[in-house]
């Protein structure tokens, strides 16, 4: 049987394009603005408050300018500010002029207030503020107008400038300090609720004050004249420079906030806001009245930024009695599990364990700098994703910041240079005049209460019990009936559940999703299918769930959540689960445990589509009443009482049930009183679990999925497959455990792609976008979820449920329906990439002859069949709902721009050589170069032979230069115009970067955004290994994030790096469409990118988890229109060229993309089809039958494609574009880009599910009909004047480059000198390639080097630095030497201090680095060939290494060698704790037994001493026999038989493969 929806009446323009039930377009913090920054503090313990410290804070702020951003006017800053102590000496002048006595110390409260500019509104605001202050029994002393110089502001900042005044208040005797701050906090909260428009209180305290504004950092002190006044003194300062993805100045969003300066992004914000809103109804703390606590609410607000909300949560804890340090520990906890260092501090683990059951972490990259005036401190997130460097002087002066070297302190006075490691804190107790280090801080907080005892007594843990093996149903037919009724299809069982049970991992697939969106499909879909997973890109990074799993957890807690504000033993009364998937045995244990459990059925009597809404209302009412009656756990179950669902019964979809109950309990103020468990038949894939947890479920029992596993294992066919060896033999318990393991691994991946470590933080966070759900439904059950195009009502959902129900009743077929959602099948779901489409295209491109003089009729006929096939398709994509709306008469084709002009806008997708065969990859490149278009190298480097222009092609189209290709012409080149820089940095060398016209930073991939990649060893041939600087057969891992891009300012730095090495190449950034991409793109434009590429969710892939292909990302139509709109609104559209890709197949697609704002167009899968791909959909198996996507030699020989076929395809596309332009009456694509007024909603479309779609978000773009100036882009953006320009301008340097001679030069550096040496490297590589330069240039530097010092260094270059360096030293280093030593006057021991930052030697393809000191996190991450000696490192050292040699002469952090598949590393372990810090998944740790290994180690240390004079190195060499036994050697499997690791192996000459 095949079930289809009945077609509804055709849509009309009005019913689709407009809808009174307006869709929700997203929270402001998601779609309007994200931010990042540079942040830090300065404190002086011993001295009195002075003005010098304030001056130094302003200077430090100025040194962070490159971490900030500016508005479209390039002058108005995104925000800068300082927090200091109250400047009493300055304010004394105000009191003196008024003959007022100045209140003592902490009896004076000062509010820094942004008031309306309009005088009458200002008076109203002042009066209300004074009224509220007096109600708090405080005395208003007066208002002080803050002196400012508005002339220094940018145009936009000036237009939005508030009137700035300070209100001065005092309190009665006995009310000072903390009590005064409490009253000011209450007053400010009350004031803020009424005066929200054009009004903001920056700070209101008796201890701290905040000066901030929408200015550049160097302007802050010029604007606020107070800050330059010698009477402005302080003993501490917190400073912050903001980079916003928006350009509309908003003064209140500058930082610091009231307590906090935040660098990073909270990924879990919506969940944190929802849970904090739930807590507001139950706030209770001794010493506070209920009325006072209610006055504080709402504490958080969806309209505010992540930093603002985190500050608000932090302030609640601080003002109710916690120190800022303890509050930060609660809200942003460290990863205390799997932390060897905490074994000596069990109380700290107990503290975090206790609060893990009360407070979900605010998760995401974060350097927090905070102060309440008594304490000033800083803390880092659990993953250490922001830099934090500090130094301490001998007279207890401490400077901490995002970069080293921002304050110029005498080197002789510095006693310590350090960094915060992941989860660590440092603080200054200003009252006690003490510097507090990490464990001292945490012990102090953890020992206040017996948290460990409370947990031991109160908490119950549900162990992972064995699964029930007894089947629920007696016969297979009943199972099929239940599966059908609950929405299973044959593919769900065979391609999802069975692989999970048999293999213990999620199924992998390829080629992307080419089926209709759920709301557009004529097939029934589950409610889950309307939700698209969001993911991290640019503003925060994804994380690696495999290699960095030690910081992740799926643990969940059941029961009532206790009072966050007052620790009590009973708050630990919870049940802890290892993961949210509970089996039947575990569910029963929960029901019989210590907490009150109640079941609520989600079944209802089937009585038409309206019966679901009635059942839902009843469910919500029952849930509320049950919780009010004392239930602590609510089990929402769709298990029928009679064991099976009957013909007259249906069920509320579990996602709808849990979302509705979750939100209605929040609204009723009951959510924290009970946890929700979902006991359901309709949950089997990882996406289903993620949705349920994301909308409020704490645990899920997928009873029908578990039953499906049992039935599969018991099936005779399964047993026979195991008997004959076609399936691995496993028993039933193993199959059930495999299923659980697969779900858990999939959940880790879904969390990690958003950059979230803990499921507790994902819980209720709603990190999805709904596509196709109506506003009423969303508000009812999924409030706060973006749903831009509207869609289904509750009745429509009921209709889908009934369709599935109709498959099972009254009579079930003999097998489950196969709708072909994954694999194409005749009669199944429509697939854009079908065999029919492929065949017609193959015929067209084969028949077309360039210059055919009118003889191409047959070719055009075939192309017309191809075009019609796609034109007449069922509605599949959002663009299919639109049609052209010409506003002028058609013109003749001769008047339209040429094919040759149009094809220059075309690009191929970034498909790697590794995913594609060499033949297919080079064929695409040659074709695009013939067209004057652009091919993309993808990840993996490129053979230098491809940079040649062919001049040896014979009459048969063959060339000895590229003998494996056919159909060649003289003048061809296989050089990819676009060179991709992906997270693995494989083959990214100076020569590679210099050979590109564009350099593409791949932030995400359409088919698997937020995920990394892995090229299996079997695909790494000798040729691939040569290109990627690896060894054949070694698995090559591309991390999920770029490890030098954790935020928008990090991306700006990489863009800067690429512009630095190749100033003639454009830099593009590839993003994937998701809600909020517009504001991300605005940040990318401000980060100085030249091109932004928006990929749709339907992009192709060589291999990806099936759940990612189907459920991650959004359509490019939503992405392109959002980006175009935001860039236009922010006056940034002229800065970047916009490119669209994802499922483009015809000229009609190109014109649609152009009308929506795209200027260039990417083609991936379809270009492969044009060269011969037959859509076999086996890319992920390495068995492509036509040699397109395989590395197997025998299969590659089957490749028959020639460049001409691809050329022909793009000519067809361009001709179609021309005909459509003529039809619209326009002469060029430039004339129609961004012109959505030329689009209208189709009136002839018939959708089967809803008439409630609204396409306003696609059609309502800024009117650009007249103003087209934004299409005029600067060819390549500049970095402006840089130190390298001065170096290159030196005649001696020019002489050395041009004549390969020797030159030595000396320069001073500061931290704003970034990417030093790289432009010199590019100039050499352009002339000589990677290895051809035989001269030698030595550059000596002194000072604090900015980021990316020595990036892409080349052979023949030596950089020697006295001082210190920030992050990314030696990034992409290809050769030469980098030497870094402390300043000559430094008095500290180098081996105990930090000298270089995070992520150094990232992706190095050669060279040597010697650093006389310690490095930060992720040293030598993805190192390919580089060698280095350092004297200590942070976490994740040598992560993903594939080659090279690393020596560490000091302590390291945890997770050493994670994902390390090649190379060797040596670690000096004087403490004996290295084994517990190693990630043992791949590498083996062994002592050095091979003589070649000892020789290698000693020679590198010897070289280190020669270059740096290292005292530690000298001591080791002087006592070699004593030290040798303390070294460990980390050896991956690929190196176990190398002579350095294995003394039994003789040294043989290594084979070197060169390009062929």
From Swiss-Prot:
Query: What's this protein's name?
Result: Ferredoxin-dependent glutamate synthase 2
Positions bound to [3Fe-4S] cluster: 1173, 1179, 1184
Q: Which PROSITE patterns did the record assign?
A: GATASE_TYPE_2
| Organism annotation | Synechocystis sp. (strain ATCC 27184 / PCC 6803 / Kazusa)
Domain (Glutamine amidotransferase type-2) spans 37-431
Could you say which residues form the signal peptide?
A: none
InterPro entries with a match to the protein in the record: Aldolase_TIM, ET-N_metabolism_enzyme, GATase_2_dom, Glu_synth_asu_C, Glu_synth_asu_C_sf, Glu_synth_centr_N, Glu_synthdom, Ntn_hydrolases_N
Q: Where is the active site?
A: 37 (for gatase activity)
Name the Pfam families for this protein: GATase_2, Glu_syn_central, Glu_synthase, GXGXG
Keywords (alphabetical) are: 3Fe-4S, Amino-acid biosynthesis, FAD, Flavoprotein, FMN, Glutamate biosynthesis, Glutamine amidotransferase, Iron, Iron-sulfur, Metal-binding, Oxidoreductase
Annotated family: Belongs to the glutamate synthase family.
| Enzyme class label | oxidoreductase
How does the cofactor attach, per the note? Binds 1 [3Fe-4S] cluster.
A Gene Ontology annotation in the biological process aspect, one of them, is: L-glutamate biosynthetic process
Molecular function per GO = 3 iron, 4 sulfur cluster binding; glutamate synthase (ferredoxin) activity; glutamate synthase activity; metal ion binding
Please give the pathway this protein is involved in.
Amino-acid biosynthesis; L-glutamate biosynthesis via GLT pathway; L-glutamate from 2-oxoglutarate and L-glutamine (ferredoxin route): step 1/1; Energy metabolism; nitrogen metabolism
Segments for region (Disordered): 1533-1556
Task: Tell me the cofactors it needs.
Answer: [3Fe-4S] cluster; FAD; FMN
Q: Might you give the EC number(s) for this enzyme?
A: 1.4.7.1
Q: Which reaction does it catalyse?
A: 2 oxidized [2Fe-2S]-[ferredoxin] + 2 L-glutamate = L-glutamine + 2 reduced [2Fe-2S]-[ferredoxin] + 2-oxoglutarate + 2 H(+)
């Amino acid at each position: 049987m095949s079930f289809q929806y009945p077609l509804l009446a055709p849509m009309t323009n009005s019913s689709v394009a407009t809808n009174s039930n307006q869709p929700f377009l997203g929270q402001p913090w998601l779609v309007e603005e994200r931010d990042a920054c540079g942040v830090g503090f300065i404190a002086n313990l011993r001295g009195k408050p002075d003005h010098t410290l304030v001056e130094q804070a302003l200077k430090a702020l100025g040194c962070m300018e490159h971490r900030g951003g500016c508005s479209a006017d390039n002058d108005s800053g995104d925000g800068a500010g300082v927090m200091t102590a109250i400047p009493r000496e300055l304010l004394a002048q105000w009191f003196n002029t008024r003959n007022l006595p100045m209140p003592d110390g902490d009896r004076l409260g000062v509010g820094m207030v942004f008031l309306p500019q309009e005088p009458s509104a200002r008076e109203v605001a002042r009066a209300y503020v004074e009224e509220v202050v007096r109600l708090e029994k405080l005395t208003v002393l007066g208002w002080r107008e803050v002196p400012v110089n508005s002339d220094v502001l940018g145009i936009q900042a000036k237009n939005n400038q508030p009137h700035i005044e300070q209100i001065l208040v005092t309190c009665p005797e006995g009310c000072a300090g903390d009590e005064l701050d409490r009253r000011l906090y209450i007053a400010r909260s009350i004031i803020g609720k009424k005066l929200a428009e054009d009004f903001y209180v920056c700070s209101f305290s008796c201890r701290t004050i905040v000066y901030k504004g929408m200015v550049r950092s160097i302007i802050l002190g010029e604007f606020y004249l107070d800050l330059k006044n010698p009477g402005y003194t302080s003993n501490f300062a917190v400073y912050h420079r903001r980079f916003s993805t928006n350009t509309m100045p908003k003064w209140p969003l500058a930082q610091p906030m009231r307590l906090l300066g935040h660098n990073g992004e909270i990924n879990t914000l919506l969940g944190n806001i929802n849970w904090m809103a739930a807590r507001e109804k139950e706030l209770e703390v001794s010493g506070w009245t209920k009325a006072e606590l209610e006055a504080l609410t709402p504490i958080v607000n969806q309209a505010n930024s992540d930093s603002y909300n985190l500050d608000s949560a932090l302030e609640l804890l601080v003002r109710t009695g916690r120190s800022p340090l303890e509050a930060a520990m609660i809200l942003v906890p460290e990863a205390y599990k799997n932390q060897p260092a905490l074994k000596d501090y069990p109380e700290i683990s107990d503290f975090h364990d206790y609060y893990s059951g009360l407070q979900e972490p605010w998760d995401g990259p974060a350097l927090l700098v905070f102060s309440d005036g008594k304490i000033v401190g800083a803390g880092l997130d659990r993953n250490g994703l922001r830099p934090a460097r500090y130094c301490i002087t001998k007279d207890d002066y401490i400077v901490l910041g995002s970069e080293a070297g921002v304050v110029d302190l005498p080197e002789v006075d510095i006693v310590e240079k350090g960094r915060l490691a992941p989860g660590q804190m440092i603080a200054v107790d200003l009252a006690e005049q003490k510097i507090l280090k990490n464990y001292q801080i945490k012990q102090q907080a953890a020992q206040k209460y017996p948290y460990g005892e409370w947990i031991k007594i109160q908490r119950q843990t549900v162990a992972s019990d064995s699964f029930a093996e007894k089947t629920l149903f007696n016969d297979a037919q009943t199972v099929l009936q239940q599966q059908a009724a609950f929405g299973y299809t044959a593919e769900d069982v065979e391609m999802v559940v069975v692989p999970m049970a048999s293999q213990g991992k999620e199924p992998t697939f390829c080629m992307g999703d080419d089926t209709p969106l759920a709301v557009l499909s004529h097939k029934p879909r589950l409610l889950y299918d309307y939700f698209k997973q969001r993911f991290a890109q640019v503003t925060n990074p994804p994380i690696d769930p495999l290699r960095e799993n030690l910081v992740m957890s799926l643990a969940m807690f059941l029961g009532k959540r206790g009072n966050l504000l007052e620790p009590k033993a009973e708050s630990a009364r919870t049940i802890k689960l290892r993961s949210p998937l509970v089996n039947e045995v575990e569910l029963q244990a929960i029901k019989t445990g210590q907490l009150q459990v109640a079941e609520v059925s989600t079944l209802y009597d089937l009585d038409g589509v309206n019966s679901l809404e009635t059942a839902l209302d009843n469910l919500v009412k029952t849930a509320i009443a049950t919780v009010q009656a004392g239930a602590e756990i609510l089990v929402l179950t769709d298990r029928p009482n009679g064991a099976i669902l009957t013909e007259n019964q249906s069920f509320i979809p579990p996602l709808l049930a849990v979302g509705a109950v979750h939100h209605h309990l929040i609204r009723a103020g009951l959510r924290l009183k009970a946890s929700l468990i979902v006991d359901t038949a309709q949950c089997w894939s990882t996406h289903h679990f993620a949705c349920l947890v994301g909308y409020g479920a704490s645990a899920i029992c997928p009873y029908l999925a578990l039953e499906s596993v049992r039935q599969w294992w018991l099936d005779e066919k399964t047993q026979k497959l195991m008997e004959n060896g076609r399936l691995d033999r496993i028993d039933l318990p193993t199959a059930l455990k495999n299923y659980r393991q697969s779900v858990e691994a999939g959940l880790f991946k879904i969390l990690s792609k958003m950059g979230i470590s803990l499921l507790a933080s994902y819980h209720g966070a709603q990190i999805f976008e709904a596509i196709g759900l109506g506003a009423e439904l969303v508000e009812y059950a999924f409030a706060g979820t973006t749903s831009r195009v509207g869609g289904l009502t509750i009745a429509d959902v009921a209709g889908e449920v009934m369709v599935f129900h109709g498959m099972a009743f009254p009579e079930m077929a003999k097998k489950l329906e196969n709708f072909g959602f994954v694999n194409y099948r005749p009669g199944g779901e429509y697939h854009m990439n079908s065999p029919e489409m492929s065949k017609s295209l193959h015929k067209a491109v084969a028949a077309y002859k360039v210059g055919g003089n009118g003889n191409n009729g047959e070719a055009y006929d075939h192309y017309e069949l191809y075009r019609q096939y796609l034109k007449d398709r069922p509605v599949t994509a959002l663009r299919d709902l639109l049609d052209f709306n010409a506003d002028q008469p058609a013109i003749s084709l001769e008047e339209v721009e040429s094919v040759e002009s149009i094809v220059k806008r075309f690009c191929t997708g970034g498909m790697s050589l590794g995913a594609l065969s060499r033949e297919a990859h080079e064929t695409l490149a040659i074709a695009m170069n013939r067209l004057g278009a652009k091919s993309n190298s993808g990840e993996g480097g490129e053979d230098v032979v491809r940079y040649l222009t062919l001049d040896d092609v014979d009459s048969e189209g063959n060339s000895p230069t590229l003998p494996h290709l056919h159909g060649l012409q003289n003048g061809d080149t296989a050089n990819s115009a676009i060179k991709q820089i992906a997270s693995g940095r494989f083959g990214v060398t100076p020569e590679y970067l210099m050979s590109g016209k564009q350099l593409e930073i791949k932030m995400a991939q359409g088919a698997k955004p937020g995920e990394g990649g892995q090229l299996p060893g079997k695909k790494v041939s000798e040729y691939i290994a040569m290109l990627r600087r690896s060894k054949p057969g070694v698995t090559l891992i591309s991390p999920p994030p770029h490890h030098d891009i954790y935020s928008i300012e990090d991306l700006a730095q990489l863009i800067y790096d690429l512009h630095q090495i190749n100033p003639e190449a454009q830099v593009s950034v590839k993003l994937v469409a998701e809600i909020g991409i517009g504001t991300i793109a605005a940040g990318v434009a401000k980060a100085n990118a030249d091109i932004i590429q928006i990929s749709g969710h339907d992009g192709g892939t060589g291999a990806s988890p099936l759940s990612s292909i189907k459920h991650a990302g959004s359509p490019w139509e939503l992405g392109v229109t959002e980006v175009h709109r935001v860039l236009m609104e922010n006056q940034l559209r002229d800065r970047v060229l916009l490119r669209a890709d994802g499922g483009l197949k015809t000229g009609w697609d190109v014109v649609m993309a152009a009308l929506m704002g795209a200027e260039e167009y990417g083609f991936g899968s379809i270009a492969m089809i044009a060269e011969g791909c037959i859509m076999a959909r086996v890319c992920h198996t390495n068995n492509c039958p036509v040699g397109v996507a395989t590395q197997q030699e025998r299969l590659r020989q089957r490749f028959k494609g020639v460049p001409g076929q691809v050329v022909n395809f793009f000519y067809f596309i361009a001709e179609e574009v021309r005909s459509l332009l003529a039809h619209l009456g326009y002469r060029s694509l430039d004339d129609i880009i961004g012109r959505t007024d030329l689009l209208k909603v189709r009136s002839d479309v018939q959708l089967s599910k809803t008439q409630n779609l609204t396409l306003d978000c696609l059609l309502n773009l800024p009117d650009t009909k007249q103003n087209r100036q934004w299409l005029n882009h600067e060819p390549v953006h500049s970095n402006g004047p840089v130190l390298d320009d001065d170096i290159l301008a030196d005649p001696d340097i020019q002489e050395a480059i041009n004549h390969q001679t020797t030159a030595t030069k000396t320069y001073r550096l500061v931290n704003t000198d970034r990417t030093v040496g790289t432009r010199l490297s590019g100039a050499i590589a352009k002339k000589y390639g990677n290895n051809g330069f035989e001269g030698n240039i030595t550059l000596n530097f002194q000072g604090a080097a900015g980021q990316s010092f020595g990036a892409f260094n080349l052979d023949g270059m030596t950089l020697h630095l006295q001082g210190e360096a920030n992050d990314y030293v030696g990034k992409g280093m290809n050769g030469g030497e980098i030497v870094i030593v402390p300043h000559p006057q430094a008095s500290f021991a180098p081996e105990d201090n930090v000298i270089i930052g995070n992520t150094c030697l990232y992706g190095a393809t050669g060279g040597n680095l010697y650093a006389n000191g310690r490095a930060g996190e992720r040293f030598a991450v993805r190192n390919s060939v580089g060698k280095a000696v350092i004297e200590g490192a942070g976490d994740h050292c040598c992560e993903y290494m594939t080659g090279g040699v690393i020596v560490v002469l000091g302590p390291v952090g945890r997770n050493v060698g994670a994902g390390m598949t090649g190379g060797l590393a040596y670690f000096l372990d004087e403490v004996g704790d290295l084994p517990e810090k190693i990630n043992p998944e791949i590498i083996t740790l062994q002592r050095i037994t091979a003589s070649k290994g000892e020789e290698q180690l000693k020679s590198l240390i010897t070289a280190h001493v020669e270059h740096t004079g290292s005292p530690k190195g000298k001591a080791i060499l002087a006592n070699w026999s004593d030290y040798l036994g303390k070294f460990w050697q980390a050896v991956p499997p690929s190196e176990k038989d190398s002579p350095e690791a294995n003394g039994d192996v003789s040294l043989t000459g290594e084979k070197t493969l060169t390009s062929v």
